[in-house]
Amino acid sequence: MATHTEQLTRPAVRLQGLTRSFADRTVLDGIDLDLPAGQFTALLGHSGSGKSTLLRAVAGLDHEVTGSGQLTAPERVSVVFQDSRLLPWRRVLDNVLLGTDGKEAAERGRAALAEVGLAGRERAWPGELSGGEAQRAALARSLVREPELLLADEPFGALDALTRIRMHTLLRELWERHRPSVLLVTHDVDEAIVLADRVLVLERGRIGLDLTIDRPHPRSYRDPLLGEYRERLLTALGVTEHQGAQEDHQ
């Protein structure tokens, strides 16, 4: 089995000259990007900057992009959205198993639910779950496919602050156990710094900043050494520290 260091020497995703336009507006402007296998990457940008468009392109959900994009294992890609997208007429385990088959699928589904803290909720209906529990079920659904690439589009954006912190811990623990490549789209600078080892800033359709976060895990929001990274990211986003503090409390 390849070590984590060996994984990082080969790209799971390679984008070359990726371009996407809507009417007369270019959203992605010739993006070149490698995402190494096993790396946790976060993508920041203003609303409308093209973050979700880039994620959809990597996931193979947007067929209007030009340029080239190559995934080493596109059949083992999972996507988690802000909305858990659980089918309300199917029980939790059935939602987790959607698109899977084989004798071992149910066993993998139960194991995935246990791993995200939902053991015993297999027969629950989605409407019986809290927002955090629904996102845990969505993560279990992504895990059961044993993805090499996990794409997460603002997965915690609709959760309260305390639940978000708990989900941050869970996502990082799951990544450390399974080591997929992760591309996390977020608008939250602190979320990116605490979770990711590499943070990209999308600006005017291009990667404006590519920053390595060289701090050990687990990380704390209160770590003063993360302040330098935060300042660089806010500057790249065109936000002052004072503005960032105001936005965090809105």
Swiss-Prot record:
Enzyme class: translocase
Record localization: Cell membrane
Keyword Membrane belongs to the record: yes
Catalysed transformations (reactions): ATP + H2O + aliphatic sulfonate-[sulfonate-binding protein]Side 1 = ADP + phosphate + aliphatic sulfonateSide 2 + [sulfonate-binding protein]Side 1
Keyword entries, A-Z: ATP-binding, Cell membrane, Membrane, Nucleotide-binding, Translocase, Transport
InterPro entries hit by this protein: AAA+_ATPase (IPR003593), ABC_transporter-like_ATP-bd (IPR003439), ABC_transporter-like_CS (IPR017871), ABC_transporter_ATP-bind (IPR050166), P-loop_NTPase (IPR027417)
EC number(s) reported in the record: 7.6.2.14
GO MF terms, alphabetically ordered: ATP binding; ATP hydrolysis activity
ABC transporter domain residues: 13-229
Top-rank lineage group of the source organism: Bacteria
Gene3D superfamilies: P-loop containing nucleotide triphosphate hydrolases
Entry membrane topology: Peripheral membrane protein
Binding residues annotated for ATP, in chain numbering: 45-52
Gene Ontology CC terms: plasma membrane
Recorded family membership: Belongs to the ABC transporter superfamily. Aliphatic sulfonates importer (TC 3.A.1.17.2) family.
Subunit structure: The complex is composed of two ATP-binding proteins (SsuB), two transmembrane proteins (SsuC) and a solute-binding protein (SsuA).
Function noted in UniProt: Part of the ABC transporter complex SsuABC involved in aliphatic sulfonates import. Responsible for energy coupling to the transport system.
Protein's recorded name: Aliphatic sulfonates import ATP-binding protein SsuB 2
